[in-house]
Regions:
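Transmembrane beta-strand segments that form the barrel wall of outer-membrane beta-barrel proteins
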Residues: 33-39, 317-329
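Extended, hydrophobic alpha-helical segments in both membrane/secreted and soluble proteins
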Residues: 52-54, 157, 301-307, 311, ...
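Conserved alpha/beta core surface patches that mediate binding of polyanionic ligands
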Residues: 12-16, 298-303
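Surface-exposed loop/interface segments of Gram-negative outer-membrane beta-barrel transport/assembly proteins
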Residues: 1, 40-45, 51, 55-138, ...
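Residues embedded in well-ordered regular secondary structure
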Residues: 1-43, 81-83, 126-129, 146, ...
Length: 333
């Protein structure tokens, strides 16, 4: 069996985009939409992405310019389950092991001696009954202002807002070897009665029914506001310049990671109830994998000032000062 030929393919990527641009002597705009699809060299692995972009720049008068930029993206990625290393499997698995039987059914070979029977493995079955997917969405908005207050003074301001959401799912159903190993029993075989065979329920069987669903959801909301005022003036051989500015940044992360058991994706993504007082090793498993909540916020404020004096384009004197504050710095006593 040529495992490399069965588990890998020629990577194929295609991208498409359309854009519109236009304007007049006071304003201009640009808009685009794009789509990309990447089928990775590994079967069952790929990425699909959509993105949009819009930019508008306008001159309100001869001294004030205003710009707006909005962009968004949506992507979906699929990978093999984290328990599967396709490259290692193709390299280490004997070529004498077939993928299918003579009747074209999947061929399963003994891979582990479970407590309630031999656990058999087939890589295609494993890829079909497990998965790992990532969904990512993001939107960014930026507004910038440029104001020529006077011939020797200029003010600029930039405000940026962004929001993103990442959802990850790593799952395996009860037909997979991954779950069979947790169950310590091959799929389809009746489990021992946990009352009559308490050792099986207390010491061996991690997950008697259903599969496993691990999910992680992370949301990020952030903004940046930057302002600066610059000055420059010349008096004969003297040239004076300087600037002052501030920047405020804030970023908030909210997330939840959870592992749920008894997952039945083929039955409407429902979950089966399992009594942890009867299946005691399962009860210990649930206790050892509590939900994890993420809730962090980072705030930063920066102030700066610069000044420069030049005489006769030969002698230069510079001055710089900056201060930063953050909720991560702690408190001074």
């Amino acid at each position: 069996t040529d495992w490399y030929d069965l588990l890998f393919r020629t990577a194929f990527t295609h991208q498409h985009s359309v854009s519109i641009t236009g304007g007049n002597d006071r304003s201009n705009y640009y808009m685009s939409m794009g789509y990309a699809n990447n089928n990775s060299v590994t079967i069952g692995e790929g990425l699909e992405r959509y993105n949009v972009l819009a930019k508008i720049n306008t001159r309100i008068n001869r001294n004030i310019h205003l710009g707006l930029k909005v962009s968004g993206s949506l992507s979906k990625a699929e990978h093999p389950h984290t328990s599967i290393d396709v490259y290692e499997y193709a390299y280490n698995t004997s070529r004498a092991i077939p993928l299918r039987t003579a009747s074209n059914e999947l061929y399963f070979y003994a891979n582990e001696a479970g407590r309630n029977g031999v656990l058999s493995y087939n890589i295609m079955n494993e890829l079909n009954h497990t998965g790992n997917k990532n969904d990512n969405s993001a939107i960014d908005v930026a507004v910038n202002l440029d104001w020529k207050v006077a011939s020797w003074m200029r003010f600029s301001s930039i405000l940026g807002l962004s929001r993103s959401n990442v959802t990850q799912e790593n799952w395996g159903d009860e037909q997979s070897y991954y779950i069979s190993s947790m169950r310590q029993s091959p799929y389809g075989k009746m489990l021992p009665n946990p009352i009559e065979d308490s050792e099986f329920a207390e010491r061996y069987c991690l997950l008697p029914f259903g599969g496993e669903l691990m999910t992680t959801n992370t949301r990020n909301t952030s903004y940046t506001w930057r302002n600066s005022l610059s000055l420059m003036q010349s008096f004969g051989k003297h040239e004076v310049s300087g600037s002052i500015g501030q920047e405020v940044r804030s970023s908030k992360y909210d997330g939840l990671s959870s592992t749920q058991y008894g997952y039945l994706p083929e039955r409407g993504k429902k979950f089966v109830d399992i009594d942890p007082t009867v299946w005691k090793r399962y009860g210990a498993l649930v206790k050892s994998h509590p939900d994890v909540v993420t809730d962090t916020k980072n705030n930063v404020i920066s102030l700066y000032a610069t000044a420069a004096y030049v005489y006769d384009s030969r002698y230069i004197l510079n001055f710089n000062i900056r201060t930063d504050g953050s909720n991560k710095f702690g408190q001074s006593k």
